[in-house]
């Protein structure tokens, strides 16, 4: 059942369906990656909806959106995302390794995505990413900005 939940999650992501993605998480789920640390299906779902809406919002960014998954097991997956980073308009190719734990109903209880933040920041941010992407300072700035964006997104709903 857990492998099917992972497949359902990424199929919804490929369609940019953040609501369906949220339905894959338990109410008390936790999500963590290099940018976000979230608790609860509401927050996690809002993050996915915010990201999906950012891609869907403009035809030029929608045309660059590609998601590929592979090596899906009942506890992990590898996925690659091609997209335009909406803040800078720069193209990004990000390789992510995901690890999951599930509740008894097969819903995601913990989701941890790992990716090379410096590689991501060089693509997404350009020169600032090249120079500072390896530093905690830039990572914390990106986290803070992402958190503020998510807070604004939640306030609108």
Regions found by a protein language model. Name each.
Residues 1-157:
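C-terminal and inter-domain tail/linker signature
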